[in-house]
């Protein structure tokens, strides 16, 4: 069995006196897209920050595979306001041992993969719509060719038709790059359109409420299947279906 790229083992975390996560055990397998769902404040973003190395568990153990390159994207795009879209992405590659011209070309390519091109690349963040800023931030994360992509509500600022196109596009890019992704979403349909597996967290302090391995590949799921799976996830999240949580999520 291939070792997971990321593991949370009985992880807990609190902000001050407020417990946010409790007893979280998740294995993130290589090559899969895993979505985290749950109510606001249940610790989804905290798990992303831990995976990115920005927070340390209060208790329990977090393990990353040796040499694992991570790239986070948070709800706030955090773009540099004095740089245009192209140079925002290219700047994220400055630590790479490649010539400046190659950095710019790689940035251009990955921006095009997220649906931005031409005059849009010369626009500054304040000139871009919220959805465009999200796509620049996504391109910046993808550009560094991470092993593990950490996305916190990456499609939230997009209108529904564009979000649906981006689900397929981002999944294709992740697969082409042989990457792994951990994605936070509040939208069950979004999870079904992009993920291989969904982990549902309870209200704070977040605990594993349920785990669902989704059948087939997202691109083969019909509209009726998407609606049925999303309804099941929402029912699990709302406590309307009995939950039989796996002793360790992701471990068979």
What residues fall within each predicted segment?
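Catalytic Walker B motif of ABC-type/P-loop ATPase nucleotide-binding domains
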Residues: 149-153
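Conserved ABC ATPase signature
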Residues: 124-128, 132
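Conserved catalytic motifs of ABC-family nucleotide-binding domains
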Residues: 145
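The feature captures the beta-strand-to-loop junction immediately N-terminal to the Walker
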Residues: 37-39
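Conserved ABC ATPase "signature" region
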Residues: 102-119, 172
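Helix-to-loop junction immediately C-terminal to a conserved catalytic motif
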Residues: 52
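Hydrophobic anchor residue at the start of the ABC signature
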Residues: 138
């Amino acid at each position: 069995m291939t070792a997971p790229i990321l593991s949370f083992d009985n992880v807990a975390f609190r902000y001050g006196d407020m417990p946010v996560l409790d007893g979280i055990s998740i294995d993130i397998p290589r090559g899969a897209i895993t979505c985290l769902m749950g109510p606001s404040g249940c610790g989804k973003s905290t798990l992303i920050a831990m995976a990115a190395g920005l927070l340390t568990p209060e208790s329990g153990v977090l393990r990353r595979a040796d040499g694992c390159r991570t790239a986070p994207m948070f709800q706030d795009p955090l773009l540099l306001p004095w740089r245009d879209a192209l140079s925002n992405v290219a700047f994220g590659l400055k630590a790479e041992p490649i010539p400046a011209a190659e950095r710019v070309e790689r940035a251009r390519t990955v921006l095009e993969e997220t649906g931005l091109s031409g005059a849009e690349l010369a626009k500054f963040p304040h000139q871009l719509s919220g959805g465009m800023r999200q796509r620049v931030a996504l391109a910046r994360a993808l550009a560094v060719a991470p092993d593990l992509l950490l996305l916190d509500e990456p499609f939230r600022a997009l209108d529904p038709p564009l979000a649906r196109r981006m689900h397929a596009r981002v999944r294709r890019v992740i697969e082409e790059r042989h990457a792994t992704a951990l994605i936070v979403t509040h939208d069950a349909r979004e999870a079904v359109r992009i993920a291989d597996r969904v982990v549902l967290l309870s209200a704070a302090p977040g605990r594993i409420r349920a785990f669902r391995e989704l059948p087939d590949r997202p691109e083969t799921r019909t509209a009726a299947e998407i609606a049925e799976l999303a309804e099941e996830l929402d029912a699990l999240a709302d406590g309307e279906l009995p939950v039989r949580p796996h002793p360790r999520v992701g471990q068979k």
